[in-house]
């Protein structure tokens, strides 16, 4: 039977099971961000932190979270589904963060770096990240900005993921191809017009030669995130010589994750293509 455990189980080394662990528990950070582990039978091939999408305002906890974790575990990976901080439905509706504050950059990447740190402290194998839509922007941010410890608590634990898989990702914060809702969710009300911030979080501008290998997927008919986002990232990865594989499907749409009910004939292949890719890559730790 597939075991669904949490990082807390690994940390405490007990037979107690809890479905989630609060990643900031015991720190001065007041956030409810959580991590749930889906573990394979036997030694994992690698660990993958999974970041669901949701425009940086909410999260698709099932199709891009739970189902992804279950699938990865069934294929021999230790999957850790991260419920990171988002702007939230209230702030999406009422635009209150400009006055009262709330979750915004760098809260999201701090959560992902914290998750990578906690997993690495318990597991010495490869640790990567997979994200969907806005979650794709988040995991690619981790692949580019690992030189900055947004958690202020890594204490020497490497923050660079060993591989990343942005799936139909948001990439740019620049017009005209940005996903405006994700930009607002990430930057926060009152900062969306700040061109310096837009540029600093437009990932096509910050690819590093030492960024980890990338599995990139996009669909030509994506009605939510302009697929040109992925094209910009693909070009930047090529320019910097970063090992990557880009998968382009003519028909697939957006938001399918690991939900087979949303697959097209083309997107039904994406999981197998990811498994083929990860079996071939050189993790090339730095």
Predicted regions: what is each one?
Residues 210, 215-218, 222:
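Short beta-strand/loop motif that positions the catalytic acidic residue
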Residues 45-53:
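Short beta-strand element of the alpha/beta-hydrolase
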Residues 33-36, 91-98, 231-286:
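C-terminal catalytic histidine-bearing segment of alpha/beta-hydrolase fold enzymes
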Residues 26, 169-206, 212:
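Mobile cap/lid helix-loop segments that gate and shape the active-site cleft of serine hydrolases
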Residues 19-43:
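N-terminal cap/lid segment of alpha/beta-hydrolase-fold proteins
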Residues 223-232:
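Conserved alpha/beta-hydrolase "acid-adjacent" motif
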């Amino acid at each position: 039977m597939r075991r669904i455990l949490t990082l807390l189980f690994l940390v405490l080394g007990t037979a107690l099971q809890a479905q989630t662990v609060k990643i900031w528990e015991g720190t001065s950070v007041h956030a409810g961000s959580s991590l749930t582990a889906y573990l394979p039978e036997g030694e994992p091939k690698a660990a993958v932190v999974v970041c669901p999408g949701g425009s940086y305002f909410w999260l698709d906890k099932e199709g891009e979270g739970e189902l992804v974790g279950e699938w990865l575990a069934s294929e021999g990976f230790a999957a850790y589904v991260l419920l990171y901080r988002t702007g939230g439905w209230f702030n999406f509706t009422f635009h209150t963060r400009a006055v009262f504050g709330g979750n915004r950059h760098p809260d999201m990447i701090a959560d992902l770096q914290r998750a990578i740190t906690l997993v690495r402290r318990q597991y010495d194998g490869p640790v990567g990240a997979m994200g969907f839509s806005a979650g794709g922007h988040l995991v690619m941010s981790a692949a580019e900005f690992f030189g900055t410890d947004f958690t202020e608590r890594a204490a020497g634990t490497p923050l660079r993921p060993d591989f990343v898989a942005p799936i139909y990702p948001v990439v740019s914060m620049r017009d005209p191809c940005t996903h405006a809702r994700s930009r607002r969710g990430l930057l926060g009300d009152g900062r969306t017009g700040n061109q310096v911030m837009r540029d600093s979080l437009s990932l096509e501008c910050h690819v590093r030669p030492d960024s980890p290998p990338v599995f990139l997927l996009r669909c030509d008919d994506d009605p939510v995130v302009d697929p040109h986002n992925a094209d910009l990232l693909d070009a930047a990865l090529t320019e910097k010589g970063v090992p990557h594989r880009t998968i382009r499907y003519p028909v697939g749409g957006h938001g399918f994750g690991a939900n087979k009910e949303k697959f097209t004939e083309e997107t039904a292949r994406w999981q197998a293509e990811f498994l083929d890719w990860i079996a071939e890559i050189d993790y090339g730790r730095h």
